[in-house]
């Protein structure tokens, strides 16, 4: 029996993002082979998005870029983008990620759980630093954004950037898995 191959393209070469998309799809389609690749895709927003709106737009821009580039090559079945950002909410600053998934002519959007941030970290971000660099300095790590991320550091490894992305991707896939009942939007 031949297994179905699902080709996915991730709008990043970051192994955390590629692994998260691969793991999510393997959970959703356990009888399929997941063929994943990443590509550099511009977000069109600041390197460290500071609002919910910019973070969402960055993920959408990355997915659209991947889809446009792929029209000249072989097309993927699904396109994924994960854009991490921060915002200051009523309860304080927090980081989160938006997930954008392109499939045929459909676009699905999801958002990860949020992680409250210490005010000193948020102030450094307001001054123009990226979260990964701030966390590397604070915890004396190197390139944490391609490992457990701020999530891994602040939860003592009980959650990671990858696990957060994986869960968010699975949830964002719901409209694509059930297109008939998601036909209408608000």
From Swiss-Prot:
Keywords: Hydrolase, Magnesium, Manganese, Metal-binding, Nucleotide metabolism, Nucleotide-binding
Binding site for Mg(2+): 75
Source superkingdom: Bacteria
Cofactor note text: Binds 1 divalent metal cation per subunit; can use either Mg(2+) or Mn(2+).
Matching InterPro entries: ITPase-like_fam (IPR029001), Non_canon_purine_NTPase (IPR002786), NTPase/PRRC1 (IPR026533), YjjX_NTPase (IPR050299)
Gene Ontology MF terms: ITPase activity; metal ion binding; nucleotide binding; ribonucleoside triphosphate phosphatase activity
UniProt-listed Enzyme Commission number(s): 3.6.1.73
Record-stated family: Belongs to the YjjX NTPase family.
Protein task: Phosphatase that hydrolyzes non-canonical purine nucleotides such as XTP and ITP to their respective diphosphate derivatives. Probably excludes non-canonical purines from DNA/RNA precursor pool, thus preventing their incorporation into DNA/RNA and avoiding chromosomal lesions.
Complex and partners: Homodimer.
Protein name: Inosine/xanthosine triphosphatase
Originating organism: Shewanella baltica (strain OS185)
